[in-house]
């Protein structure tokens, strides 16, 4: 996780977005695939966590809560992580809204991606069998006068402590173990993530949930 803002990332840069055509009594209606899945209460975080992607996820979470505050939201994550502040805006919104947010790791959930995966509703956090999870402490690369560097170092340590305490709460692991295990990059398989408490179950088929 980087405490600085990650570079802007355009979801459209993933390439051509498929369109889905639906028939209705009024004729045909075309949706991009993500809008169609949003109707099914599915949200994607694909790529780095930054202000752009975080704002999109937060807006969709709030929209789906307004649509139906009693139905679960399904949050699919394939992310290498990114900005702590952007990620925390997603985390806080997940905790703030009324619907349960079920998280599912597809591909990878690293750094802030792993943090958000772990933050899903208890019993509703999943990963596909070949996905990877990585946890570590926040990164910082501030340059400047010694006094300013000291200020930023203190802030990084404060953020690290806050993130570790939240992860301990959601995973059920002792804070001391979280601190030890996030001191360096720590890679886990889906099964290891389940054993650790970052997720609740490894899914091999949809009906296994």
UniProtKB/Swiss-Prot annotation:
It catalyses: Hydrolysis of proteins to small peptides in the presence of ATP and magnesium. alpha-casein is the usual test substrate. In the absence of ATP, only oligopeptides shorter than five residues are hydrolyzed (such as succinyl-Leu-Tyr-|-NHMec, and Leu-Tyr-Leu-|-Tyr-Trp, in which cleavage of the -Tyr-|-Leu- and -Tyr-|-Trp bonds also occurs). It is found in: Cytoplasm. The active site is at 111 (nucleophile), 136. GO terms for cellular component: cytoplasm; endopeptidase Clp complex. It is an enzyme of class 3 (hydrolase). The keyword Membrane does not apply. Pfam families: CLP_protease (PF00574). CDD domains: S14_ClpP_2 (cd07017). One of its GO terms (biological process) is protein quality control for misfolded or incompletely synthesized proteins. InterPro entries: ClpP, ClpP/crotonase-like_dom_sf, ClpP/TepA, ClpP_His_AS, ClpP_Ser_AS. GO terms for molecular function: ATP-dependent peptidase activity; ATPase binding; serine-type endopeptidase activity. Its main location: cytoplasm. Keywords: Cytoplasm, Hydrolase, Protease, Serine protease. Its EC number is 3.4.21.92. Fourteen ClpP subunits assemble into 2 heptameric rings which stack back to back to give a disk-like structure with a central cavity, resembling the structure of eukaryotic proteasomes. Belongs to the peptidase S14 family. NCBIfam families: clpP, PRK00277.1, PRK12553.1. Cleaves peptides in various proteins in a process that requires ATP hydrolysis. Has a chymotrypsin-like activity. Plays a major role in the degradation of misfolded proteins. HAMAP family: ClpP. This is ATP-dependent Clp protease proteolytic subunit. The lineage of its organism: Bacteria, Pseudomonadati, Pseudomonadota, Betaproteobacteria, Rhodocyclales. The gene is clpP.
